[in-house]
Design a protein with these regions (language model features):
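Aromatic-capped interface at the extracytoplasmic side
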Residues: 1-3
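Soluble "head" domains of membrane/secretory-pathway proteins
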Residues: 9-304
Length: 304
């Protein structure tokens, strides 16, 4: 999982809805104690819908917090595979082939998106940048929290590392792959503490961090990495700089930076946007700037 070593698949989480303020139901006609499905059918009706409203909480989202939130792309899902990222699949395969491959589509209300849990690494107004796998906020390196792990290539002397030692270090043995040709492990997820322990093992020859640089180490990077545009040479390990929008802030809109803000303006803030003759129109009026109506946050898993 993307939070492995901090949180594990199967863990039971207790979530306070009062911390940041409880969100009022937007889809009140829901079967009690269900979220969006019961069996393979929706557990709610959209007959009654209300606007987004959140009551005041005890505090604000802060950098480093674990946050449970609705997956942003979860407003549209494939009925037969709701865990698949609809928008990434559409970009990768094309709409017609994707629908043929995955089947019918369901549009979900905002409060019925699947829940994700990640760590907040940037809040509204921050400028986020990832350089060789390290997070920087406003040009300053961010604290590396316990539990954050990166991927490493571990070369051995031709012998596998004793599984007992790997288990003691805290690695999930079922997820490890040993490549005889290397010889070694091409992708070991390690925290800083685990890294030092692996380096000290007698049959380890070298340990190198896996860094994804442009051109990306895997195909179709612009289809899987925000803002999903070939004009942005970003990868998961070298990303940004990206300014995180905050309520009331105004940004100049250009055709060059539009991919960064288009989905916020349309999907999250409910505006119509189009581009005609090289000009940007919002709600049928030409726009050279935009003022954000909400604060935004950047979440990231600890398993990086």
């Amino acid at each position: 999982s993307s939070m492995e070593s901090s949180l594990y698949t199967g863990d039971h989480l207790f979530v306070s809805k009062l911390a940041y303020g409880p969100k009022m139901p937007q889809t009140p006609l829901t079967i009690p104690f269900t979220h969006n499905v019961i069996g393979r059918k929706e557990s709610y009706s959209t007959l009654i819908q209300s606007d987004y409203k959140r009551l005041k909480g005890f505090g604000e989202v802060e950098t480093g917090d674990y946050v449970v939130f609705g997956f942003p792309h979860g407003d549209t899902v494939f009925v037969n595979d709701p865990a698949a990222d609809y928008y990434t699949i559409i970009r990768t395969y094309g709409r017609d082939y994707a629908h043929k491959l995955y089947g019918p589509v369901k549009v979900r209300p905002s409060d019925k998106k699947d829940h994700y849990v990640k760590r907040c690494v940037a809040v509204a107004g921050d400028t986020l940048e990832i350089i060789d796998g390290r997070v920087y906020i406003d040009s300053e390196p961010q604290e590396v929290w316990p539990g954050v792990q990166n991927s490493y290539t571990v070369v051995t002397n031709g012998q596998r590392i004793n599984p007992v030692n790997l288990d003691k270090i805290g690695l999930n043995l079922s997820e490890l792959w040993y490549d005889q040709k290397l010889p070694g492990y091409p992708a070991l997820p390690l925290t800083a503490e685990m890294l030092e322990k692996v380096k000290s093992l007698p049959n380890v020859v070298s340990v190198t961090e896996n860094i994804d640089r442009w051109p990306a180490d895997y195909p179709d990077s612009e289809k899987t990495i925000f803002p999903f545009s070939p004009d942005f040479k970003w990868t998961r390990d070298n990303f940004g700089p990206l300014w995180i929008p905050e309520k009331g802030a105004e940004v100049e809109l250009t055709l060059e930076n539009l991919p960064l803000y288009e989905r916020i303006i349309t999907s999250y803030e409910g505006n119509e946007l189009s581009v005609r003759d090289g000009k940007i129109f919002i709600n049928s009026e030409e726009a050279q700037s935009y003022t954000f109506a909400q604060d935004y946050y950047f979440m990231m898993g600890d398993n990086r």
